[in-house]
């Protein structure tokens, strides 16, 4: 049986230098994201979202990036879920993208805000019917006795709304407004390249190199 301690990979695909990156962290992220798309990285828009509850207990889960613009990173969820409750109490959060095939990570820290009703409506109505009904049927993070209960709820809302369910008031989008972004490139001998963008009050960014 292989020892977990003996599992290791040496990274050697690429390097990362301040002279080669974009002055804008969001443009740099888009550059890396497009390269991950081209490389056919699985679930390229999957990201770990970390939040903290009022007692200081952190939580993390995978969510999907659904929009990226000059303001930040957008994802959608149930506002009444554990993460929604935690973000209501403390809007500070972090994201992590891990594109293992490219030996890259991107870490993002910032403040989360709800997107507009119009943005939530537009994305909700672009989803498959089953996903739209599921947003009604699932009281996310609450206890349920069995799967049959969920399926019965889905059938109930399908009968009620047909193929035109409205967006539930408890479901919508969040946008993380980045204040720090770290781009990590795996390198040999664990001497990885780490570049961090730090946002200033005037909206400008400073780029620094961090020790691995």
Swiss-Prot record:
GO biological process: pyridoxine biosynthetic process
Catalytic reactions of this protein: pyridoxamine 5'-phosphate + O2 + H2O = pyridoxal 5'-phosphate + H2O2 + NH4(+); pyridoxine 5'-phosphate + O2 = pyridoxal 5'-phosphate + H2O2
Superkingdom per UniProt: Bacteria
Enzyme Commission code: 1.4.3.5
Record keywords: Flavoprotein, FMN, Oxidoreductase, Pyridoxine biosynthesis
SUPFAM superfamilies given in the database record: FMN-binding split barrel
Family matches, as InterPro entries: Pyridox_Oxase, Pyridox_Oxase_CS, Pyridox_Oxase_N, Pyridoxamine_oxidase_dimer_C, Split_barrel_FMN-bd
Species of provenance: Ralstonia pickettii (strain 12J)
Binding locations of substrate: 8-11, 66, 123, 127, 131, 190-192
Listed name of the protein: Pyridoxine/pyridoxamine 5'-phosphate oxidase
């Amino acid at each position: 049986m292989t020892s977990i301690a003996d599992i290791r990979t040496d990274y050697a695909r690429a390097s990362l230098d301040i002279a080669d990156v974009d002055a804008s962290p969001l443009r740099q992220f888009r550059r890396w994201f497009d390269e991950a798309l081209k490389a056919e990285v699985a679930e390229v828009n999957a990201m770990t979202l970390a939040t903290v509850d009022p007692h200081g207990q952190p939580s993390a889960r995978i969510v999907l990036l659904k929009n990226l613009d000059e303001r930040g990173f957008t994802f959608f969820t149930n506002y009444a879920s554990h993460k929604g409750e935690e973000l209501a109490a403390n809007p500070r959060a972090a994201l992590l993208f891990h594109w293992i095939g490219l030996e890259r990570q991107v870490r993002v820290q910032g403040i989360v805000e709800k997107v507009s009703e119009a943005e939530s409506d537009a994305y909700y109505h672009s989803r498959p019917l089953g996903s739209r009904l599921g947003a009604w049927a699932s009281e996310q993070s609450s206890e349920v006795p069995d799967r049959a209960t969920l399926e019965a709820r889905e059938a109930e809302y399908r009968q009620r709304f047909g193929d035109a369910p409205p967006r539930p008031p408890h479901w919508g989008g969040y946008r993380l407004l980045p204040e720090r972004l770290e781009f990590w490139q795996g390198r040999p001998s664990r001497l990885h390249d780490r570049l961090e963008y730090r946002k200033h009050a005037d909206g400008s960014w400073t780029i620094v190199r961090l020790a691995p």
